[in-house]
Amino acid sequence: MSSPAAQTPYALVPTDAEWERLDAQHNGIAKFLDHKLAPVDLGQPKKILEIGSGSGAWAIQAAKQFPDADVLAVDQNPLPARPLPSNIRFQQLNVLEPFPFPPGSFDIVHIRFVLCHLPNGYTVLPRIIELVAPGGWLLVDDIDFLHAFEGLDKAPGVKSGFTGLIKSMESHDADPHFGKTLKGLLESSSALSEVNVQKVELPINPTPEXPALGPLSRTMRQAFSNAVGAEKLNPDTVTKGGLTREVQQAFLNEMGGDAQDWSYSVHLYFSWSQKRV
């Protein structure tokens, strides 16, 4: 692996609290997706790759659903110590560097909420597409942190927290709105024969009453609270995003309250695309 200075920029430091946050976020999203990796028949994959494996939660789900597949989880940080299915392997790497895999190596490639954090993430996507085998599936999920702050006049702490997060991402050429570009980027690839993108307009507050959206809203609200309000942040994030402890505490106080007089939404994008044969 490269030296720490060459790692991909990321606001959060790998801690037990971060692993718990990622597990909870995965579990909430998995419930929303009906515990399916994708809403299509993925066949009988033999090799599965997850890029940006974090706590390993998605890789564990994939390994259990496809016990005959070899699941490779990759990330710039090691997986936390936890029980893993026997068909999971881990490899430490930096996604900004050339992949050490031949083109077409994997029947399924998955990446969630990673491209938005990368400098010029749109340049990384074609290299990821290359890794998918002909007829295989690319599963990309990402987010758009909306700049629509009109509903936050009565929640200045929430506004400052999300503003700081967006500023810190933009400071290293990441794209907090990457999700809204995903469909166009995928459709522009001649290597894909089928592109499907599901856009989810998700209110963080007030919590939606819809049976599916309500639990997902609560999941993501808690995930954002634990991320922006984390005790340990990348120092660069604090400096460039202005996420001081005072800003964090105001964010946590309002996100943890039950006031209904403010509103904010994010857009989530879930995609499944098939590689041309």
UniProtKB/Swiss-Prot annotation:
Which pathway is recorded for this entry? Mycotoxin biosynthesis
Give GO BP annotations, semicolon-separated: methylation
Q: Which is an annotated GO molecular function term of this record?
A: methyltransferase activity
Q: Does this entry carry the keyword Zinc?
A: no
Q: What induces it?
A: Induced in strobilurin-producing conditions (on CGC medium after 6 days of growth).
InterPro entries, per database record = SAM-dependent_MTases_sf
Q: Which UniProt keywords apply?
A: Methyltransferase, Transferase
In terms of superkingdom, the source organism counts as Eukaryota
Biotech application, in the record's words, is:
The structure of strobilurin A was used for the development of the major class of beta-methoxyacrylate agricultural fungicides since its beta-methoxyacrylate toxophore targets the Qo site of complex III of the mitochondrial electron transport chain and prevents adenosine triphosphate synthesis. Compounds such as azoxystrobin (Syngenta) and Kresoxim methyl (BASF) are among the most widely used fungicides worldwide. This class of antifungals are used as effective treatments against a broad range of destructive fungal plant pathogens and make significant contributions to food security.
Cross-referenced PANTHER family:
METHYLTRANSFERASE (PTHR43591)
In UniProt terms, what function does this protein have? Methyltransferase; part of the gene cluster that mediates the biosynthesis of strobilurin A, an antifungal polyketide that contains a key beta-methoxyacrylate toxophore that targets the complex III of the mitochondrial electron transport chain. Strobilurin biosynthesis begins with construction of benzoyl CoA by step-wise elimination of ammonia from phenylalanine by the phenylalanine ammonia-lyase str11, oxygenation by str8 and retro-Claisen reaction to form benzoic acid, which is activated to its CoA thiolester benzoyl CoA by the dedicated CoA ligase str10.
Q: What is this protein called?
A: Methyltransferase str3
